[in-house]
């Protein structure tokens, strides 16, 4: 673990290359975290056999997307609950795939014909399943968050580097046409340096699972802080990753207040609301807020630059330019603009694109993106936020390992 916890991103990519993961460093889009990856740039004619581990609600999205990814064949489904995998396959498979079914992950991993697995299980299980799959010589696509602690992330990165297999994480906004258009606008408009962000995830409470959805006697994991990480992990994983993408800098300190305060919801010890402030090495600051009792509309994500304010939401990006009072108005001050970010992507959120890209990674034509380093950055913030709330102090990210 100690050999991986302090790897810089450039070092991580270099070691990954030596381990046989993807292309050499030169010319890859990952040298700058803020780059926009072109998902369809290098098509593959190969077909990779995938096993699905975890057939819960999130698997609907992944399986549905795989119907549109001919490079990946759904070969095996695994879930602890008997017949749950069969039911999910019958519901979601539309491309004629006929997978085998398992209740024991280790038995599925023995399939020699299996090239890769998708890990779509509760957050606290990711580390052990990912490591088992890598040790079984499988490429791994793992849903977010990477894990619940930085220590677990470091262990996963170490096994990944030794395995020589690909490990990619499912923060799909990095592959979403909408978010890539946002990043492209950020780079091509004269907005200046991004100094601060104000981001929110306000939503309703989690759905009520069916009585037979989990093994008998197993409580709903999303209501358990130790298993889910609470509202910051459950909802922050997406937008915090986007913020890291925009800031293109390392988080260095985290402060948070959070807890359970809406007792009209189901009984839980997982936080139902949170406020988080993060300082980055480049001086930028993120403000994040989330809750699971919103019955109104979502707030806009706002980024404040030295020359402009950007607000994103509802498929649109608005940019308003300005200058400080007391200074002459710049002659070339651009007009405010509203940019449509909604393209013709029928899935909408980047899931199909990230799976196409994962096939290219397995074919050696791309590097995993997001990789373990990128995914770990979000965990640094989220674990730091939870510890800050528990210990009532600012957390230095270096404390987390």
Which residues fall in each region the model found?
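N-terminal secretory signal peptides and thylakoid transit peptides that target proteins
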Residues: 2-20
């Amino acid at each position: 673990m100690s050999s991986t916890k302090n790897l810089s991103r450039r070092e991580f990519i270099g070691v990954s290359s030596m381990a046989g993961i993807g292309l050499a460093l030169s010319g890859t889009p990952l040298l700058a975290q803020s780059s926009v990856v072109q998902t369809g740039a290098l098509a593959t004619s190969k077909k990779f056999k995938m096993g699905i581990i975890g057939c819960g609600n999130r698997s609907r999205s992944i399986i549905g997307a795989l119907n549109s990814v001919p490079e990946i064949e759904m070969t095996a489904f695994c879930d602890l609950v008997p017949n749950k995998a069969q039911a999910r396959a019958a519901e979601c498979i539309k491309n004629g795939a006929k997978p085998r079914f398992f209740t024991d992950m280790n038995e599925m991993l023995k399939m020699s014909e299996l090239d890769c697995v998708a890990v779509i299980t509760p957050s606290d299980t990711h580390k052990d399943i990912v490591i088992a799959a890598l040790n079984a010589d499988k490429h791994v696509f793992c849903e977010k968050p990477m894990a619940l602690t930085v220590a677990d992330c470091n262990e996963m990165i170490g096994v990944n580097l030794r395995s020589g297999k690909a490990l990619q994480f499912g923060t799909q906004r990095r592959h979403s046409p909408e978010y890539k258009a946002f990043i492209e606008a950020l780079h091509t408009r004269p907005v200046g340096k991004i100094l601060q962000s104000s981001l929110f995830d306000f939503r309703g409470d989690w759905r009520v699972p069916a009585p037979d959805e989990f093994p008998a006697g197993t409580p709903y994991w999303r209501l358990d802080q130790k298993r889910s990480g609470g509202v910051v992990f459950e909802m922050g994983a997406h937008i915090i990753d986007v913020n890291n993408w925009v800031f293109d800098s390392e988080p260095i300190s985290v402060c948070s207040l959070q807890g359970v305060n809406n007792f009209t919801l189901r009984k839980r010890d997982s936080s139902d609301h949170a406020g988080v402030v993060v300082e980055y090495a480049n001086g930028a600051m993120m403000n994040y807020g989330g809750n699971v009792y919103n019955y109104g509309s979502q707030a806009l994500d706002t980024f404040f630059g030295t020359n402009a304010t950007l607000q994103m939401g509802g498929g649109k990006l608005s940019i308003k330019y300005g200058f400080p009072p007391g200074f002459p108005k710049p002659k070339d001050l651009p007009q405010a603009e509203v940019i449509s970010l909604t393209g013709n992507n029928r899935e909408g959120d980047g899931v199909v694109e990230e799976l196409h890209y994962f096939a290219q990674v397995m074919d050696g034509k791309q590097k995993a993106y997001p990789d373990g380093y990128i995914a770990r950055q979000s965990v640094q913030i989220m674990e730091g936020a939870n510890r800050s709330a528990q210990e009532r102090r600012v957390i230095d990210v270096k404390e987390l390992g």
